[in-house]
């Protein structure tokens, strides 16, 4: 029996039998939601939900208990309880193979625009767990179940090697400094290149007398004085690893500009800058360093700033909207209409269902915006985003650094997927 026949057979039989949620802990030791969906044929899907530190104000609501006597208010027993009662009852007997129908039930149960009743941390856990259970039922990997025969493009990793901003306790304004292995031919090559640069970066920082402690996402968190010092160190590490800066390994940054914007100016490097002055700083950096991507270059509320930076740099580098779009198809459509950014960061927990996540990806792709699927700073060992990246041909992925197991879990899963695809696998090239 072929795969298609197996899928059709399973779809006519298997139904959702049980939905179970529980409270577990993420990589920062904070509670998060884990969901298991069990089907009538014994198939199981399990998903644990991440949480962000730098959160866009338009994101769907992450519901927490607020009880200061337990986990300093970070508990998630409220969304867990709602999954185990309201959601579980409503999904019992439903087919797991119609993802849009499942997600419409979740949206109807919540009934709010921002998932504030059930919590996006509950709905995304259920939504993804249903998809994983369906894939398990038909006996194929999630990326094949979601993407079919066209799912063969491996994402290029943007690897966070130096942390700053809200992700580290240091002096750096910018949140992430990343290396991008643009010269790689396969994902395995990309992983090797990034690992070798990461090793060398540690040596370089130690010789300079800097700490090699790591931040939330596994990157080093040295007390370098300013952002350009970081770029200098990264270029040095790349070249001392035997690679060429630019043609082998390029640089990317997540500025997270909303975190140092006060509504009128940007408090950057000890100065108050206008949008235009901050853009001029970016232009200078791009002219001096092999930077190919800047994420959240402007605050999500600084729409005129976004228009200006896109006009001035949009034909030179990738300008990624995270807080600007928060994985919301409507906000992406608005960005396209107003020529804001040219790439979209996708975080499934920002929007709250798999269907809406895929809709956001397709909306971006239809309008020739690049797509980068992303982890969060508070992560788990869950590897679902690796499968979505390949299934939807996202092209790029952010999963943190080459330390901390919750970060490497995604990279390791991509190595397995590339092996599974064999010679049909292709590595996306951002240049």
UniProtKB/Swiss-Prot annotation:
GO CC, sorted alphabetically, is: cell surface; extracellular region; phosphopyruvate hydratase complex
Which Pfam families does the record cross-reference, listed alphabetically? Enolase_C (PF00113), Enolase_N (PF03952)
Cellular localisation: Cytoplasm; Secreted; Cell surface
Coarse class of the protein's main subcellular location: cytoplasm
The catalytic site is made up of 217 (proton donor), 347 (proton acceptor)
For molecular function, the Gene Ontology terms on record are: magnesium ion binding; phosphopyruvate hydratase activity
Show the coiled coil region(s).
none
Q: What is its EC number?
A: 4.2.1.11
State the InterPro entries in the record.
Enolase, Enolase-like_C_sf, Enolase-like_N, Enolase_C, Enolase_CS, Enolase_N
Q: What does this protein do?
A: Catalyzes the reversible conversion of 2-phosphoglycerate (2-PG) into phosphoenolpyruvate (PEP). It is essential for the degradation of carbohydrates via glycolysis.
Which protein are we looking at?
A: Enolase
């Amino acid at each position: 029996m072929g795969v298609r026949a197996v899928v059709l057979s399973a779809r006519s039989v298997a139904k959702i039998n049980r939905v179970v949620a529980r409270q577990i802990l993420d990589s920062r030791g904070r509670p998060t939601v884990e969901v298991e969906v069990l089907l009538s044929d014994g198939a199981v899907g399990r998903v644990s939900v991440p949480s962000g530190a730098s959160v866009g104000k338009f994101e769907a609501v992450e519901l927490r208990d607020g009880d200061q006597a337990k986990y300093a208010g970070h508990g998630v027993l409220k969304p867990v309880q709602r999954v185990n009662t309201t959601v579980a009852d409503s999904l019992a007997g439903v087919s797991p193979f119609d993802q849009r129908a499942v997600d419409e039930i979740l949206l109807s149960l919540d009934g709010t625009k921002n998932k504030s009743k059930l919590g996006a941390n509950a709905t995304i856990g259920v939504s993804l767990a249903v998809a994983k259970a369906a894939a398990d039922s038909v006996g194929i990997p999630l990326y094949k179940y979601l993407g079919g025969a066209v799912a063969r493009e491996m994402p290029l990793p943007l690897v966070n090697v130096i942390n700053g901003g809200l992700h580290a306790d240091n002096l750096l304004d910018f949140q992430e400094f990343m290396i991008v292995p643009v010269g790689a031919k396969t994902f395995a090559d990309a992983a090797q290149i990034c690992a070798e640069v990461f090793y060398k970066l540690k040596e370089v920082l130690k010789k300079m007398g800097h700490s090699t402690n790591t931040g939330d996402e596994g990157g080093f968190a040295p007390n370098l004085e300013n952002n350009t010092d970081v770029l200098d160190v990264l270029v040095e590490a790349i070249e001392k690893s035997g690679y060429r800066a630019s043609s082998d390994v390029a640089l990317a940054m997540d500025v997270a500009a909303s975190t140092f914007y006060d509504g009128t100016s940007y408090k950057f490097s000890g100065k108050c800058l206008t949008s235009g002055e901050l853009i001029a700083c970016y232009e200078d950096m791009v002219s001096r360093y092999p930077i190919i991507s800047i994420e959240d270059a402007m605050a999500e509320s600084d729409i005129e700033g976004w228009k200006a930076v896109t006009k001035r740099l949009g034909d030179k580098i990738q300008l990624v909207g995270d807080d600007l779009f928060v994985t919301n198809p409507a906000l992406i459509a608005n960005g396209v209409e107003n020529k804001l950014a040219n790439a979209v960061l996708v975080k499934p927990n920002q929007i709250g269902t798999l269907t809406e996540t895929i809709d956001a990806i397709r909306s971006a792709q239809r309008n020739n915006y690049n797509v980068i699927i992303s982890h969060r700073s508070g992560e788990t060992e869950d590897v679902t985003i690796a499968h979505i990246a390949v299934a939807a041909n996202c092209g790029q992925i952010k999963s943190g650094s080459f330390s901390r197991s919750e970060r490497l879990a995604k990279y390791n899963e991509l190595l397995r997927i590339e092996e599974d695809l064999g010679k049909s696998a292709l590595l996306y090239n951002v240049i």
